[in-house]
Swiss-Prot record:
Sorted UniProt keywords: Endoplasmic reticulum, Heme, Iron, Membrane, Metal-binding, Microsome, Monooxygenase, Oxidoreductase, Transmembrane, Transmembrane helix
Transmembrane portions of the chain: 10-30, 304-324
Tissue-specific expression: Expressed in storage roots, primary roots, petioles and vascular tissues. Expressed in the outer cortex cells, the endodermis and around the xylem, phloem cells and laticifers.
Record family assignment: Belongs to the cytochrome P450 family.
Keyword Endoplasmic reticulum tagged: yes
Organism: Manihot esculenta (Cassava)
Membrane topology: Multi-pass membrane protein
Binding positions (heme): C451
SUPFAM superfamilies linked to this entry: Cytochrome P450 (SSF48264)
PROSITE patterns xrefs: CYTOCHROME_P450
Name used for this protein in its record: 2-methylbutanal oxime monooxygenase
Length: 511
């Protein structure tokens, strides 16, 4: 979704807004600037601002690219005024480390954004909730009850079931092409849906198809670039004119209806007891538990389910498809990746088992390189400063929204040799990891706000990639060449390849 919200309004509305609001907001903007100068603060450098909109006019449909271009001129700590929101963008390893390690205490909150706020039932979740005692307790429950390594292992049945379906599709496809992008997204949806709602519910195709459409609409809501976020007073009016407000309400109502239906099904005393508890079962157990530090309601359950689906499907699926796209475009690299997987696992197996994935060291390199060049969320979920602090020698005031441009960090030539080249081998003898201690690579963030679903997400990514590389060799449809496969970034909160992967899978023949 474009950040340049005002361009979506008819010219006559812009004129009306300017006449009524320009004098007031101009006074506020310049008074704020004068106050900072009087205090002797050293704010980060940044581009000049316009009255009323600040720097919004300089951002388009790919804000992470716009931020990267501006940072080349203004540096790795850059200040922008997005409407009424003071904003800082960090674009280097050093500054991201300062934010998420050295200044984590002061800057680990979240801005109160309208889309995430509504979808999280007024910030009852873990991903978007501001820092507080409530958030700390909820995060403990979330990790211990739902995302611990013990729980991740429990959910292997869902991954294996969905992989068996994928194997059946790919084995029977030749000589016809398959839309692998679509199949990967369907597989991730099937895994997360089964883990969250259970086999019985997610096996209902009509329910699943409808829910998938609703989930796709929620991704637009989670984009922070809505007018109401930048203009607290008149932004809601602007969103109502553009239709964004009605769309947000419609999407929330739709997804809430699905969550309510699933919870009621799980509360039915006549429901057959499943072999393995799904996430809704676990959360309902917590609802009934009187010993928790706070009372868990249906809204808490729904907010956590939203985190599970939004964080579990798109980010994993785009990582898998980007990795496969890069390998497909480079046949020599694809051959090496397949040989490494097959050598580690051995011949003539129906599928790569979960316990075998850890033996495939080259898969780790592929995943890391994909996170570097194609972080699934190019602009990490924004931080929000609670106290005055300094980053990169500049003053960061309370109430500042702070973005980490993970995409820009992956293109830094001072850190990465030939950053435009996709080269998993760069990680062969490297200790750099993505679990929050190495700030060269932070696709999941770091510090208090590191993504709690890291283990579950990377487990699925490595498992699916290993199997796709192990079982089949791939041909391009007639008239297409591997080298000509386009890599075009598209999206909002998450960024995927605009071009779907259309390939002809051919079962690998062992010597």
């Amino acid at each position: 979704m474009s950040v340049a919200i005002l361009t979506s309004l008819p010219p006559q509305w812009l004129s009306i807004l300017a006449v009524f609001l320009l004098p007031i907001l101009t006074l506020l903007l310049f008074r704020g600037k004068d106050d900072n100068q009087k205090k002797g603060l050293k704010l980060p450098p940044g581009p000049r601002q316009l009255p009323l909109i600040g720097n919004l006019h300089q951002l388009g449909g790919q804000p992470y690219v716009d931020f990267w271009k501006m940072a080349k001129k203004y540096g790795p700590v850059m200040y922008l005024q997005l409407g009424r929101c003071p904003t800082v963008v960090l674009s280097s390893t050093e500054t991201s480390k300062e934010l998420m390690k050295d200044r984590d205490v002061e800057c680990c909150s979240r801005p109160l954004s309208v889309g995430p706020g509504q979808l999280s039932y007024n910030f009852l979740d873990v991903a978007f909730s501001p820092y507080s005692d409530y958030w700390r307790e909820m995060r403990k429950l979330f990790i211990f009850e739902l995302l611990s390594m013990r729980r991740v292992q429990t959910f292997w049945y869902a991954r294996e079931e969905q992989m068996d379906k994928m194997i059946e599709i790919l084995d029977g496809a030749y000589p016809n092409p398959v839309n692998l992008t679509e199949k990967v997204f369907n597989m991730m949806d099937g895994i997360i849906g089964t883990i969250a709602f259970g086999r019985t519910t997610y096996a209902q195709q009509e329910f699943r198809d409808g829910f998938v459409k609703v989930l796709a609409a929620t991704m637009d809501m989670l984009d922070n670039f809505h007018a109401e976020n930048f203009f607290p007073v008149v932004g809601r009016f602007i969103d109502s004119l553009t239709g964004a407000l009605a769309k947000r309400q419609r999407t929330f109502t739709d997804v809430d209806r699905y969550f309510e239906k699933v919870i009621e099904q799980h509360l039915d005393p006549n429901r057959p007891k499943p072999e393995t508890e799904d996430i809704v079962d676990v959360l309902i157990g917590l609802m009934k538990d009187e010993s928790t530090s706070f009372k868990i309601t249906k809204d808490h359950v729904k907010a956590i389910l939203m985190n599970v689906f939004v964080g579990g499907i798109d980010t994993s699926a785009v990582t898998i498809t980007w990795a496969f796209s890069e390998l497909l475009k480079n046949p020599k690299l694809m051959k090496k990746a397949q040989e490494e997987v097959r050598r580690a696992v051995g011949p003539n197996k129906r599928r790569v088992e979960g316990k075998e994935v850890e033996k495939i060291k080259y898969i780790d390199c592929i995943v890391k390189e994909t996170f570097r060049k194609h972080p699934p969320v190019p602009l990490l979920v924004p931080h929000f400063s609670m106290k005055h602090c300094k980053i990169g020698g500049y003053d960061i005031l309370p109430g500042t929204t702070i973005y980490v441009n993970a995409w820009a960090m992956g293109k830094d030539p001072t850190i990465w040799e030939n950053p435009e080249e996709y080269n998993p081998d760069r990680f062969m003898n490297s200790e750099v990891d993505f679990r929050g201690s190495d700030f060269e690579l932070v696709p999941f963030g770091a510090g208090r706000r590191i993504c709690p679903g890291l283990a579950m997400g990377t487990t699925a990514v490595k498992y699916i990639l290993s199997n796709l590389l192990y079982g089949w060799d791939y041909e391009m449809p007639r008239g297409k060449k591997f080298e000509d496969f386009p890599l075009i970034e598209e999206g909002g909160l998450t960024v995927h390849n605009k071009q779907d992967i259309m390939v002809i899978p051919k079962k690998h023949k062992w010597d």
